[in-house]
Curated annotation (Swiss-Prot):
One of its GO terms (molecular function) is tRNA-guanosine(34) queuine transglycosylase activity. Signal peptide: none annotated. It is an enzyme of class 2 (transferase). InterPro entries: ArchSynthase1/Queuine_TRR, TGT, TGT-like_sf, tRNA_ribo_trans-like. The lineage of its organism: Bacteria, Thermotogati, Thermotogota, Thermotogae, Thermotogales. Its EC number is 2.4.2.29. The keyword Metal-binding applies. Keywords: Glycosyltransferase, Metal-binding, Queuosine biosynthesis, Transferase, tRNA processing, Zinc. This is Queuine tRNA-ribosyltransferase. GO terms for cellular component: cytosol.
Length: 367
């Protein structure tokens, strides 16, 4: 079984759906915590399950470097390796084309990238990316793409688009020769609408199980991100999942749902937690602030997470003040619980046709 998608309800452009995968059902819209190295930082699989995470994301390139494909084959895939029995989506390594630019070489065949671990060179092709993701055993595989950096010329964006389409075709062909894992195609096109249109036509003409919007939220202005998404999302098939790659702020998430997006991922909630920032229903809260030294309140009184049920702002501030890792753990639990709660409330609001009210509430505190 690869993937089955049901579109249960729409409210304006917002979509309430359900994805059936080999390791479970995913209710959408949904936020996916990022577990780059087969772990979500500072979280156990049990904790992830308890906060309501439905699906997590792993990074194919990093997992290919360490622990290596032989380890995944030995364990029978990532689910057994990390003891997470719910769905996993893997990024193809296309983002590393963008992020690991030093010493890279891009050809029609693939991308020569330096390992951030030891500087060794690796030629990543669409075929190798599929072999990696097949060995990892992810429920959703991403096609290998060229995520171009912001600010490139129209001419260079055309090259990136054409390589993305070529590599998408090769990714699909290779994966189908290996397994029936679900695979998503990725629409690129930088910040040019004519190229987004062309990319969407080319990628959606292929028999992918779902589609992603890539190459956005990579440093450009917010208005550009949203404008490109609102333009691109309607070009994707209604009967397949739509995934925006790299969105973790509550504001962006409600605006993406309002644009017709079903899935999103980001390291943002876990990263800001490690720096003392909590996400709450009344905006961001910096737990390091001196004003919380004598506070008995939880991070968020309306939150039902383990952290908010058991610990005060004063205690968590003390942990950060003393450099205790428990503070980072407790805030990570809270922030990911908040993201799951936000996703759940979004789903309920679409069912009840109250999504715009919820969106307005979020935008009031995350302007």
């Amino acid at each position: 079984m690869g993937l089955k998608f049901e579109l249960l309800k729409t409210s304006g452009n917002a979509r309430r759906g359900r994805i059936y995968l080999p390791h479970g059902v995913v209710e959408t819209p949904t936020f996916m915590p990022v577990g780059t190295n087969a772990n979500v930082k500072l979280m156990t699989p049990k904790l992830l399950d308890e906060i309501g995470a439905q699906i997590i994301l792993g990074n194919a390139f990093h997992l290919y470097l360490k622990p290596g494909l032989d380890v995944f084959r030995f364990h029978g895939g990532i689910h057994n390796f990390m003891n997470w029995q719910k769905p996993v989506l893997t990024d193809s390594g296309g983002f590393q084309v963008f992020s690991l630019r030093e010493g890279r070489k891009i050809t029609e065949d693939g991308v020569l990238i330096r390992s951030p671990l030891d500087g060794s060179k690796h030629m990543i092709t669409p075929e190798l990316s599929m072999e990696i993701q097949h060995a990892i055993g992810s429920d959703i595989v991403m096609a290998f793409d060229y995520c171009a950096e912001p600010g490139i010329s129209h001419q260079d964006a055309v090259v990136a688009l054409e390589l993305t389409s070529l590599w998408a075709e090769r990714s699909l062909k290779k994966l189908r020769s290996l397994s029936d894992q679900a695979i998503f195609g990725i629409v690129q096109g930088a910040f040019f609408k004519d190229l987004r249109l062309r990319s969407a036509k080319e990628i959606t003409s292929m028999n992918f199980d779902g589609f992603a919007i890539g190459g956005l939220s990579v440093g450009e202005e917010y208005d550009i991100t949203l404008d490109m998404t609102k333009f691109t999302a309607p070009l994707l098939p209604e009967n397949k999942p739509r995934y925006f790659m790299g969105a973790g702020s509550p504001k962006l998430i409600v605006d993406l749902v309002d644009s017709g997006i079903d899935m999103f991922d980001s390291v943002l909630p876990t990263r800001v937690a490690r720096h003392g920032q909590a996400l709450t229903w009344k905006g961001k809260l910096n737990i390091r602030s001196a004003k919380y030294k004598f506070s008995k309140e939880p991070i968020d009184e309306s939150c039902g997470c383990y952290t908010c049920k058991n610990f005060s702002r004063s205690y968590i501030r003390h942990l950060f003040d003393r450099g205790e890792v428990l503070g980072q753990i407790l805030l990570t639990i809270h922030n990911l619980h908040f993201m799951m709660d936000l996703s759940k409330k979004i789903r309920e609001s679409i069912e009840n046709d109250t999504f715009q009210e919820l969106r307005g509430e979020v935008l009031k505190y995350y302007a």
